[in-house]
Every structure is written in structure tokens, then in C-alpha cells.
Amino acid sequence: MIISASTDYRAAAKAKLPPFLFHYIDGGSYGEHTLRRNTDDLADIALRQRVLSDMSELSLETELFGEKMALPIALSPVGLTGMYARRGEVQAAQAAEAKGIPFTLSTVSVCPIEEVAPSIHRPIWFQLYVLKDRGFMKNVLERAKAAGVKNLVFTVDMPVPGARYRDMHSGMSGPNAAMRRVLQAMAHPSWAWDVGLLGKPHDLGNISKYRGSPTKLEDYIGWLGANFDPSISWKDLEWIRDFWDGPMIIKGILDTEDAKDAVRFGADGIVVSNHGGRQLDGVLSTVQALPAIADAVKGDLKILVDSGIRTGLDVVRMLALGADCTMLGRSFIYALAAQGRAGVENLLDLYEKEMRVAMTLTGAKSIAELSRDSLVKR
């Protein structure tokens, strides 16, 4: 398959992956309306073309939480990344480091912190949920500190798991799920050999380290459902703020009042996110939510944004609307599944090229020069 655009990786991943894995990353919650709006609403944002601006000196570099970045992009935390490529979290982290951007490790990764962090020189970011088992939370935070993690991404939009109907149909969950997954793996021998056999162990590495026994894929859905805490409030985050002395980023903000609460709480950053359309269907797309949030808290903390970002043009749109940085989830997983580390590096090259074209033709010589003046007002 010829890869000429960042969006080509989705089809490449679909061809290579067993359906239960492809649809797990590709799908959203309920009717997937928000999933579609994330991309459709972004595509509807018109860029304002400007010419004859001498764009010979153009820079995509930025700085976030004292960390220099070659691109205003970070790789998002994605659960089970190690099921999409052999030791997938390690490969993705190495690709991110090679391109000069951060990688964020998920709580529910296959590869544990102790495997991923030493695989690169750049400090990884770590993502954590609020869970009922506070002992696990303290344990994993201590391990993250010991591994040199500086930035903590705290996900707050999963007090309960979203209803993801595709997972029932694809074999990730539902009747006879284990047998269906085995049959699907047999029909995809390349994945079965490279990841299914050579990529073992397939457990939730961060959780297994704490429990002292493997937490297998079969236990994944049940563990999530049993440990997410619907009683979560800002007060529950206070002990983590006291315990964690590095930058703390609150992920899952869609409302201006929540953004203001994050400022009052003392967060260093927020991620404007609807979890890629995987939690509450029918909420705003992130590109719809971002402008009001930027108007409310820009300058008080750093604003990151994810969900629906599929091209370098989308990155430019989000930055013009007030984001300081973007985060990629699905798109890097598609590339990782298709071509491993090399695929993620190539994906980021494509994003960079697309950004350079967009910024050259909108007259923005740097990330700081992108603003709503870079967009067509409608």
C-alpha cells in the first residue's frame, strides 16, 4: 500500500490488524456522532490564505512546560498500544524522541513504565486515571517519579467507561469474545507472528507490576469497570497535587467552567478533549469547545487539545484557535500498526510537511504567529 498522506495509515492498519483491535481504536461510543464531528468540524474551519510574505524563515519549534519541542505535537496516552505493534509503547516512544516530541504512556499500557522510560533519553509523560484503588495510584506515581517522569497527565473524563457498541460486534467484548479473537488472529498471520507471539507478554504492565501477577487482556474490560471511580471530585485530586511536584495536566476538559476550575486547582495545563468521541456521545467536538475555553483561560495555564486531528492542517487550525499544543492518538496508532516505529516517524514527517505548507500559505512564520487572523471569519 502506498502511503502518501497521513490519513492513508488508517486503511493500512485495517488491513493488518485483527478486527477486534482495529475497531477498538477506530470506534467511538454509542452512535459515534461526536467521533464524526471531531473530524468533520475541523475540516470545516477555513484557513485564510496570504501570499508574498517572505516565508523563507519558518519555524515549527515550541516550548511546553520547560521542554523544547520540534513540533507542537505530543503523542497521546493510548491503552493497549503494545497490542498494535511488538512492544508498541517502546516503538512509539522511540519514534517520538527521534522527531523531538513527547510520548505519553497510558496507565493501561502493555509495556510498563520501567520498560518504556529507559528506552529513550527524553523523559516520557505519564497518564493516570482517578481509580478506587488509591494504593495503586500512589504506587504508580512513585514508580513514574523513579523513572524520571516530569509531566503527569491526569484523565478526568472516565469516571465510568463509555458504551462502545463496536467492541461487542468486533470481539473485544461480548459473547465468545476470546474465541473470536483467536480466530481473527489466525486470519491475520503477520500480526499473529510479530505481535501475538513475539510481542509477549500481553498484559497490563503497569498494573501487573503492582499486583505481582499478570493482568491479561481478558481482564482488561473488567478491571476498568471495577476500578473507575464515579465519586471523583476536585477534592480527590488535591492529594495528587501535593504528592506530584512536576507539571500536572488535566485531560478531558470541554467546558469553560471546568477550565476555570482547573486554573483554581493549580493545574499547569489542560487537554481539551472528548476522549476521541469514546465517552459521552453528543458532546461538542473539541474544535467547537476550544475557542471559548481559550478565551477563558489562555495565559493562566497551557492549553493542549486532541480528538479529530488527522493532518498537519488540523494542527494549524487548532493552534490558530488558541491551543498551545496538540495531541495525536488514533493517527499514530494507525501508523504504528501498519509500520511500527518507522510508520510513526513517517507520519510525523507528513504532519510536519503539511504544517509547513499551511503556515507558508497563511503567512505565519512561527507557532506564535498563528491566531484567529489565520482563519476565515464566517
Swiss-Prot record:
Active site annotation, chain numbering: 275 (proton acceptor)
Biological process according to GO: aerobic respiration; lactate metabolic process
Enzyme class, broadest EC rank: oxidoreductase
UniProt domain FMN hydroxy acid dehydrogenase: residue ranges: 1-378
Enzyme Commission no: 1.1.-.-
CC cofactor: FMN
InterPro entries: Aldolase_TIM, Alpha-hydoxy_acid_DH_FMN, FMN-dep_DH, FMN_HAD, FMN_hydac_DH_AS, LldD
Keyword Oxidoreductase applies: yes
SUPFAM superfamilies in UniProt: FMN-linked oxidoreductases
Subcellular location as annotated: Cell inner membrane
Gene Ontology MF annotations: FMN binding; L-lactate dehydrogenase activity
Binding residues annotated for FMN, in chain numbering: 106, 127, 155, 251, 306-330
Assigned keywords, A-Z: Cell inner membrane, Cell membrane, Flavoprotein, FMN, Membrane, Oxidoreductase
Binding site for substrate: 24, 129, 164, 278
Gene Ontology terms: cellular component: plasma membrane
Keyword Transferase: no
Catalytic reaction list: (S)-lactate + A = pyruvate + AH2
Lipid bilayer topology: Peripheral membrane protein
PANTHER family linked to this entry: L-LACTATE DEHYDROGENASE, S -2-HYDROXY-ACID OXIDASE-RELATED
Similarity remark: Belongs to the FMN-dependent alpha-hydroxy acid dehydrogenase family.
Function, in words: Catalyzes the conversion of L-lactate to pyruvate. Is coupled to the respiratory chain.
Protein name, per record: L-lactate dehydrogenase
Species this chain originates from: Vibrio cholerae serotype O1 (strain ATCC 39315 / El Tor Inaba N16961)
Gene transcribed to yield this protein: lldD
